[in-house]
């Protein structure tokens, strides 16, 4: 690798919208995410299938399908 052309990789705190914070590595000073493993439905086991069914019903209603 060439010296002096790569950004400095450092440890930073990643902050989620749910309030969870964890340490990771990045070239940025601060990292903010909307969803993390602490609040993602796949990892928490609280998956919501009703929202998908609601979208299907809305589509069927819009296009007159039964």
Swiss-Prot record:
Q: Does the keyword rRNA-binding apply?
A: yes
SUPFAM superfamilies, sorted: L28p-like
Which cofactors does it use?
Answer: Zn(2+)
Q: GO biological process: any one?
A: translation
Report the InterPro entries cross-referenced here: Ribosomal_bL28/bL31-like_sf (IPR034704), Ribosomal_bL31 (IPR002150), Ribosomal_bL31_A (IPR027491), Ribosomal_bL31_sf (IPR042105)
How is the cofactor bound here? Binds 1 zinc ion per subunit.
At which positions is Zn(2+) bound?
16, 18, 36, 39
What are the disulfide bonds?
Answer: none
What family does the database annotate?
Answer: Belongs to the bacterial ribosomal protein bL31 family. Type A subfamily.
Assembly and binders: Part of the 50S ribosomal subunit.
Described by its record, this protein's role is as follows: Binds the 23S rRNA.
Name recorded for this polypeptide: Large ribosomal subunit protein bL31
Origin organism is Anoxybacillus flavithermus (strain DSM 21510 / WK1)
